[in-house]
Every structure is written in C-alpha cells, then in structure tokens.
Regions:
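A solvent-exposed interaction/effector surface
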Residues: 1-196
Length: 196
C-alpha cells in the first residue's frame, strides 16, 4: 500500500472514531410526530439552556464568539469551577442585529443544581420547547447553506399547509474537526395538532 493509501485509511478511521465518539454525547431529546418527504415535525420538551447574545447575524462570527463564551461556562468558568458535559446540538438563533448561541444543558441538571455563570454575558434560561419542523443538511455550515435550508423548509411547510413562525433556529451537531458524516439542521416553530 502506498503512502496515500495509508493516509486515507488513517483519515477514514479517525472520522469513523469521531462519529462513534459523538454518539455518546447527550443530545437534546425530541419526539418525532410526523415525517414528510423533506422534513419532519418534532416535539421538544422544555429544556435548560446556557445562552449568550452576540452582535451580528453572520454564522462564522456568531458561532465563534458565542461558542467560546458558552463553552467557557461548561468548561469550568462557573460558580462551582467544574466541567459540565457537552451536549448536542449547539443552537443559533439569528436575528437582524443580534443572534443567540445556546447550549442545551444535560438532563441531569435542574435550574437549582446547575452552577451559575461567572461571565455575565452567559445566562441560564428555560427554553419552553414546543412543536418544530426540522430539515437536515450535511457538510460544513455557512450562511448560504443555512439560508437555503430555511427557504426550503419554509417552502415545504407552505406547500403542506402547515402554519409556522419565521423564527428559524440552526442546530449544529458536530465539532469542527469532524469532516465526514456531518449533521446540521434548521428548525422552525409550527402549529401542529397531533392525532394522538
């Protein structure tokens, strides 16, 4: 086997190891209520989140600044000085001038047991959950891919006659060093009455 073959084998082995390691990271729970051709309807329960507000609405700048602030909180910049396990996905709510970057806290924590942030720009909030439409896309996220996913989801919802609020949230599930098997989503709140 030549050197390129060896490098490719190592590369694929590392990517598979990263993917399997990520499967052990706690993910925000949800229940799938309905599956359509391009999207699904989910119900998310109430969640505890750590959130920071960033100036701007461009993915790269908001993700970097916001991620670093909230990551500081879970990596020990908190009243207990202890690490909080990372969860997935990282959530970004884009606004026209300001955007919010949020990490969902592990289910083992409640508002009373979660350490307080020592960085005033990181706030602990309760996210109410609710019914959301979700669409998935792969690769590395950027403004164009996120906008395209939002437009595709809104078009599918309109065609399907499902009422929605124009409040999209980007969900990123992977670390930047994961090149293959990337999972990105956009969710949008919808009016949905389950047939249960």
């Amino acid at each position: 086997m030549n050197i390129i073959g060896v490098i490719l084998v190592i590369f694929f082995a590392v990517q598979i190891a990263v993917k399997s390691g990520l499967s052990r990271i706690e993910q925000q729970p949800y229940k799938v209520l309905a599956v359509f051709r391009q999207f699904e309807i989910r119900n998310y329960p109430e969640s505890l989140i750590a959130q920071t507000v960033c100036t701007g609405n461009k993915y790269k700048a908001v993700a970097r600044t916001g991620f670093n602030k909230v990551a500081g909180f879970i990596f020990g910049k908190n009243s207990a000085g202890k690490r909080i396990p990372m969860t997935a996905p990282v959530r970004i709510e884009f606004g026209s001038e300001f955007s919010r970057v949020e990490f969902v806290m592990p289910l083992a924590y409640s508002a009373s047991t979660l350490p307080k942030s020592i960085d005033a720009s990181v706030q602990i909030k309760t996210w109410p959950g609710g019914n959301y439409a979700a669409i998935r896309f792969g690769g590395f996220p950027n403004d164009q891919k996120i906008r395209k996913a939002i437009e595709a989801l809104e078009a599918e919802l309109t065609v399907s006659g499902i009422s929605f609020k124009d409040e999209p949230v980007y969900l990123g599930y992977n670390p930047p060093y994961q090149i293959m098997f990337r999972r990105n989503e956009v969710i949008i709140p919808v009016e949905w009455k389950s047939a249960e």
